[in-house]
């Protein structure tokens, strides 16, 4: 029998490797196989925390730029009005506590940029790059350390810098100390400003009072000038009224004196006594009669060789005699003055200059053919007045109806 030839057997081809991730490959048969559903799970992309999304939307909203907005450059955001921001927190979060909001910022790694305002920054929180929010991670607590150790664990920094607290309230202690110092400084400035304001108020009040006094004086001066312009003889009348008032202080209406002349009782008046009154002593030269009597060198006295010095009649009569007696005495003298130039300095009415108790010259009124003498002027008779005379003059003018309108207007 013939032998049968066998075809050579080729080795079985290796089975193709199963496809990774399924798709076009078939399912693995058998009990030990696994379907695509039980294969390795593809990791999902990282999600952004809702807190970061809400904060980003608040900062980017133009309607809230006066409360919170991006800082210059867009690398940080600023809370301009913390009170208004805290009031509007409940619209975006479940709370309205500004401190809790700051705590959450610290939890996500935000840091305060400016010490004097609420400005915060993070590398993944940039204007116009919202996709970077997924890079911001929330800090996680270590399972090996207890929460109390985490809150109290300080981190040593470079020499000269303060320790930074890490934990739930990390970084807030330093901020609280800064706020306390700022508050103390502001309180001191407030006290200084209040003191300065009180001082300024007192100065302004003093200036107002001085201005009111100046305005009153100006009104009085303007009223007096208006009266003088309307009535030019007002000054002459005022001077005559003053002279009459001063004479009435010494003479009664019946012509008698109210009090005696102290110079006659106490003797001659010395310069020391009259200098304190502001009066002036006028030397009087009596006439020299043609008699055989001897003239003693006693000033103001004429006597014989055997007689005692007596006061001059011209000095004794001004306050003791009436005006008419003075005129008679002057008329009876042939030569009343040794030098007639003194008499010719007056007008034609032959007025005699008299002196009052204070040795101040006065001009008594007299009649000349039924007419009064010429009015006095301020330039001719500007005499010093005592305080008592000024008070009596003011009282008289206030009771005089002629000057009532002048006082009222002034």
From Swiss-Prot:
Pfam families registered for this protein in UniProt: HSF_DNA-bind
Sample GO molecular function, one term: sequence-specific DNA binding
UniProt KW Lipid biosynthesis keyword: no
TM region(s), chain numbering: none
GO biological process: cellular response to heat; regulation of transcription by RNA polymerase II
Keywords: Coiled coil, Cytoplasm, DNA-binding, Nucleus, Phosphoprotein, Stress response, Transcription, Transcription regulation
Coiled-coil region: 171-246
Region (Hydrophobic repeat HR-A/B) residue spans: 179-229
Positions of the UniProt region annotated as Disordered: 1-44
Record's subcellular location: Cytoplasm; Nucleus
GO cellular component: cytoplasm; nucleus
Residues spanned by motif Nuclear export signal: 279-290
Positions of short motif Nuclear localization signal: 256-260
SMART domains (alphabetical): HSF (SM00415)
Lineage: superkingdom: Eukaryota
Subunit organization: Homotrimer.
UniProt comment concerning the protein's domains: The hydrophobic-rich region (HR-A/B) corresponds to the oligomerization domain.
Function per UniProt: Transcriptional regulator that specifically binds DNA of heat shock promoter elements (HSE).
Name this protein carries in UniProt: Heat stress transcription factor A-9
Organism: Oryza sativa subsp. japonica
